[in-house]
Amino acid sequence: MTCSILVGGAWGDEGKGKCITYLCGNDKPDIIARAGVGPNAGHSVEFNGEKYGLRLIPSGFVHTDAKLMIGAGVLVDKDVLFKEFEDLKKYNVKERTFVDPRCAIITKDHRERDKKSEHLAKKIGSTGSGCGPANSDRVLRTVKLANDVPELEDYLADVSLETNDVLDNGGDVFIEGSQGFALSLYYGTYPFVTSKDTTASTFAADVGVGPTKVDEVINVFKAYITRVGEGPFPTEISQEEAESKNIEEYGVVTGRRRRVGLFDMELAKESCRINGATQIALTCVDRLYPDCARTQSYDDLSAETKKFVEEIQSETGVPVTIISTGPDLKDTIDLRKELL
């Protein structure tokens, strides 16, 4: 049995969606479990020529034999969930998705409070999804749980029990985190952070898996850094410089333009240390080094790219096992057999 957790190494938008889709398609886990805050972050998935922006359903949905679980630590907006059921109908997502009855529920009131809050909407740069107010109500013990929502009755399951049963019987579980380390309520650039911790240990707790059962922690970084909203960004470059490097990105949930910066080695080292990373996945290498676009062999990477990868490994002490060189799943260099 193996239990792997995938986490974002910076401020989110690291390319977790593609990594999850690739890893789940290749490794074929029995359960893919969503951890993290809730529908305030979007994962982009490109598969068979189609693009999907997901906020609750695990990005590994393309592995159609897996059960899809949403852990107790995740906030659920039933409207978002049901829309994704419809959007992913051909993958039979509705029939194999299960929500822990202890998930807290986001309501219209939470969304309105989020959007109307001068502090959250303007200073912090909240996505307006209602996650902050919902987590606040959870702390106050006034929030509704999934068990209280009749429309969710057919989708309820004890996620912790099911994931641990699979692991205890030799199966494989993949835990999908959201956002990124630098947005952690505890370790991020406070107060410009999200409404809970976003590290690997919390993602395990979100799903109800104990730390002794976790085998791999895969920390995802882009070859450059991006950030949506306000807050410190030490390596930020101007929009003009970003455009000169052909980098222009927009958030999946908000549509806001992402700020761009150079790779931050100090952030990477701290992220790997606190997450307990055992592997690094490096994405968007083709954006920084266009001559490496769609490369599928490490030997075919340019000397400059290899030097960059080796520097990350040397500084963090963590092997770079996955290198993404394009948006398609086949544009991936998988070095796990060689390095692990």
Curated annotation (Swiss-Prot):
GTP binds at residues 12-18, 42-44, 258, 284-286, 324-326. Pathway: Purine metabolism; AMP biosynthesis via de novo pathway; AMP from IMP: step 1/2. It is found in: Cytoplasm. Keywords: Cytoplasm, GTP-binding, Ligase, Magnesium, Metal-binding, Nucleotide-binding, Purine biosynthesis. It holds the Pfam family Adenylsucc_synt. Mg(2+) binds at residues 13, 42. One of its GO terms (biological process) is IMP metabolic process. Its EC number is 6.3.4.4. Binds 1 Mg(2+) ion per subunit. The keyword Acetylation does not apply. It catalyses: IMP + L-aspartate + GTP = N(6)-(1,2-dicarboxyethyl)-AMP + GDP + phosphate + 2 H(+). Its cofactor is Mg(2+). Its main location: cytoplasm. IMP binds at residues 13-16, 40-43, 127, 141, 179, 194, 256. It is an enzyme of class 6 (ligase). GO terms for molecular function: adenylosuccinate synthase activity; GTP binding; magnesium ion binding. GO terms for cellular component: cytoplasm. The active site is at residues 13, 43. InterPro entries: Adenylosuccinate_synth_dom1, Adenylosuccinate_synth_dom3, Adenylosuccinate_synthetase, P-loop_NTPase. Substrate binds at residues 252-258. Homodimer. Plays an important role in the de novo pathway of purine nucleotide biosynthesis. Catalyzes the first committed step in the biosynthesis of AMP from IMP. HAMAP family: Adenylosucc_synth. Belongs to the adenylosuccinate synthetase family. This is Adenylosuccinate synthetase. The gene is purA.
